[in-house]
């Protein structure tokens, strides 16, 4: 691998690296409120940005303690996106975490169509 290629790979964000595992992923930028229930049944939430999407998945950074098969809710500011999804991948890199979650059902108004 050339030095330039290695530098480009090092410069990719954690979410960009996870997106490489989803060849159909397109870059998007959608601000959402992410929420989930902790194992103790406490509601956890944060604001995040969906950075990549496919017709069935979204990829975003998160500081919440999410794991494979956790259920999350994603809601944008005008509630035109209000969906449940299941975590299908988590990637840790340089102290950051990227998450991929698959929609639990058909999302009528999702911007990326199959």
Task: Enumerate the language-model features and the residues they cover.
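Structured alpha-helical
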Residues: 1-114
């Amino acid at each position: 691998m050339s030095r330039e290629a290695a530098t480009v790979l090092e410069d990719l964000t954690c979410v960009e690296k996870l997106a490489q595992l989803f060849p159909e992923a397109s870059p998007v930028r959608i601000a959402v409120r992410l929420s989930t229930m902790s194992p103790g049944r406490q509601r956890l939430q944060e604001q995040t940005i969906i950075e990549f999407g496919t017709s069935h998945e979204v990829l975003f950074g998160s500081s919440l303690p999410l794991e494979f098969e956790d259920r999350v809710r994603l809601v944008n500011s005008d509630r035109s996106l209000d969906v449940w999804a299941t975590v299908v991948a988590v990637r840790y890199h340089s102290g950051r975490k990227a998450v991929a979650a698959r929609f639990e059902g058909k999302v009528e108004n999702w911007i990326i169509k199959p």
